Amino acid sequence: MIKTNVLRRAMDEIAARKGEFTLFALLMRADAPGTWDLVVSASWLESGNLKATREFVRLLAQSMGEESLHQFSRVVALDSNDAPVRFILENLPVEDDELRVQSTDLLGLQIQEAIIFRAKKPRPSPAALPNKALHPPAQKTRHG
């Protein structure tokens, strides 16, 4: 069995270095009992970007140990706009806890068990927020 406290620590260490995760979860598919998929989503971890996924796996191995990676049948990176991520964020939000779900259907994928460590929309980065210093409030003028 995967040591969830070790995985949580790895998640926290990687998030401190790279940025928050939108989703960090273990899923055991009904068609692959006894094996776990690690499913992650983060703004810095693009779906389909092998370089970013490779970097994530390297950081995971660095944090948990190379041998620990054999506990996962696969590591899946999803975009935050992907339907499964949006569904989990909307229906199973988790911030600093651990949510366990048994025997569920996740948008057509039969899940025997899920452990969700984080399912939270990321906070906007300071660069994405409007800078009030650059946009002062409109001045009222009197005509008269």
Predicted stretch roles:
Residues 27-31, 43-44, 79, 120-122:
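Short, flexible beta-strand-to-coil junctions
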Residues 1-18:
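Helical scaffold of the NTase/Pol beta-like nucleotidyltransferase catalytic core
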Residues 19-36:
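Short edge beta-strands and adjacent turn/loop segments
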Residues 5, 33, 48:
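Residues that form or flank phosphate/diphosphate-binding pockets in enzymes
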Residues 13-22, 65-69:
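Short secondary-structure junctions
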Residues 67-144:
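Catalytic "initiation/cleavage/transfer" segments centered on a nucleophilic residue
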Residues 35-45:
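Catalytic metal-binding acidic patch
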